[in-house]
Amino acid sequence: MKETPSDMIQEISSSKLKMNLISKNSNPNNNNNPPSRDPSLINNMSFAHKPSGQRGKNSHNLEINYTSNTNDNNIPSTSTALLQKVVDKADILEIEIINSLSMSSNLKIEINALGMIQGSKRQAKDGLTFFGLIDENNIFDTNDKKDVDYIINTNEVITEENSNILGRHFCIRFDINTMKYYIKDLGCGYGTFKKIAKKAQIKDSYLLNIGNSYIVCTFGVDEYYPEGMVIPEGNKTLNIKVFSEIAQTEPHFFNPKQFKRIYIGRDISCDIIIDDSLLSRIHCTIEYDDEEGWIIYDGKIDDDESKNKLSTNGTWLYLIEEIPIEDGLIFKNNKNAFECRLINRNKK
C-alpha cells in the first residue's frame, strides 16, 4: 500500500473527516491523463491516485488521500419481506451515466425498493445498492473484500500502490419509512460529489471540488488564524483553505460582519483567486444568511439578478453525509458523472 509521502503539506482533522493533502512535483514527460470530453463533468479527480499531468518542471500534482469514519457498517438494511410489500408502490430510481471515460455513456441503471432491478452482483434484495471496485482475482491484500452490486469501471491499472481504491465507494439506500432513496459516500476510493444545483448550506469540515481544485471549509478559530487579530463573530468565522495542482493558498478568514458576499474564481476581482484553467472567472459565491449561516451558490450571484451566471464546470460537494436523492440530481465518482431520475409508478 502506498505510504504517505514526506512532503505532506497539510493534515486536516475533524470528527467527521481526516484528509492528507499532498503536493508533489510532476513528471513533465509522464502524461497518463486521457483527454476529457467534458471537464465540467469529468475532472481528473482521483482521491487515491492521480497521474501526473504535462505541465512543466515547477508544477505540482495534487493528490488527496483521505480516511473517514464513513463506512457501510452503520447503513441499515431492510428485510426482503418488508420491501416486497412496498416495491410496487415506490418510485423507480433511474441512474444514467451521462459522461464517462471508462463506461458507456447513456447506460441506465434501474433501482427499486429492493435494490438493482437487473445485473446486481450481490443479489441481496436488502434495499441497498453498493457501487465500487472489487479485486475479482484476489490479487491484493485489501481490507475490504465485500461485494458490490455495480462495478465502476476505471481506466487505471490496479497495482499495490493504488489498491486502496478497491472496495465500496458509495451506497444508494431505499428507506421504507420515507419511501425515498438516499446516497452516501463510503470513504473509499475517489470520493463521491454532488453537483450543487442551486445552493448548499456550508457545514463544518465540508469539502468542495471546483475544477482541479479543492476547498475545505471550517468554522471558528484554528491554528492558522493570525495571532493578535480581532475575532468578530468568532464562531461564525468561515475558514477557507484551497488546494490545487499549482499550489496551496494561505488560509482565508471571513466573518459575516465584514463580508456580505465572497467570490471565488479566476478573476482578479475575486476575494479568493485560484489559478485553475477549469474555473470560471467567478466560479462560485458564498453569502451569510442570519438563519441558514454560510451558503454557497454555483456561479456569480449579484444583487441584480439579471447578472447572475452559473459556472461552466459546476461546483461539487463531497457527500460525507447521507442525502435524499431528488429528481435531476447529478453526482460524480472518479471520472464518471451520473444523473438521477425518479419514475413514479402510480403516475397515470
Where are these regions (language model features)?
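Regulatory inter-domain linker segments that are low-complexity and enriched
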Residues: 1-115, 213-281, 287-292, 334-348
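Forkhead-associated
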Residues: 117-205, 210-211, 255-335
